[in-house]
C-alpha cells in the first residue's frame, strides 16, 4: 500500500463539478492499493500517518502531528500509485489490486484513520479533480512494505 501524504492548508475534491469532500488544515492522502496488500499494510500506515510530526510548533519546528493540531484528512484513492514505468512509454498497472478488493481495503483504511482524526473522501474509482493548497510544500511517500 502506497500513501502520498501532503501537509495542506486546504484541500477539496470534485466529481462531476460538485465538491464531494473538503478539509481545512491537515493531510491530503493519495492512497494506492497494491496486489497482495492486507490488513497488516493498513495497520502499518495507521500506526505511522496520524502520528507523524510534520506540522510546525510555535518555534517553527516540525514537531506536531495532525492529531496535535486537531487537523483532518482528505483520502483519495489513486490506483496509478501502483503503476510501473519500467518498460516502454505506457505505464503498466499490473501491480494495482483488483478494484473490488482495492475498494474494500481503501474503505477499511478510511475507517481506521477516522478513529484518530476526522476524514473526508473522494469517490472510489471516479474521475476526480483534486485541489490542494500544499503547505510548505511538505510531501512524503510512504510504502507500507518499507515500514
From Swiss-Prot:
A GO MF term: tRNA binding
Motif Gly-cisPro motif, important for rejection of L-amino acids per record, residues: 136-137
Pfam family, one: Tyr_Deacylase
Subunit organization: Homodimer.
Entries under NCBIfam families matching the protein: D-aminoacyl-tRNA deacylase
Domain notes: A Gly-cisPro motif from one monomer fits into the active site of the other monomer to allow specific chiral rejection of L-amino acids.
Job of this protein: An aminoacyl-tRNA editing enzyme that deacylates mischarged D-aminoacyl-tRNAs. Also deacylates mischarged glycyl-tRNA(Ala), protecting cells against glycine mischarging by AlaRS. Acts via tRNA-based rather than protein-based catalysis; rejects L-amino acids rather than detecting D-amino acids in the active site. By recycling D-aminoacyl-tRNA to D-amino acids and free tRNA molecules, this enzyme counteracts the toxicity associated with the formation of D-aminoacyl-tRNA entities in vivo and helps enforce protein L-homochirality.
Protein name in the entry: D-aminoacyl-tRNA deacylase
Annotated source species: Persephonella marina (strain DSM 14350 / EX-H1)
Higher taxonomy: Bacteria, Pseudomonadati, Aquificota, Aquificia, Aquificales
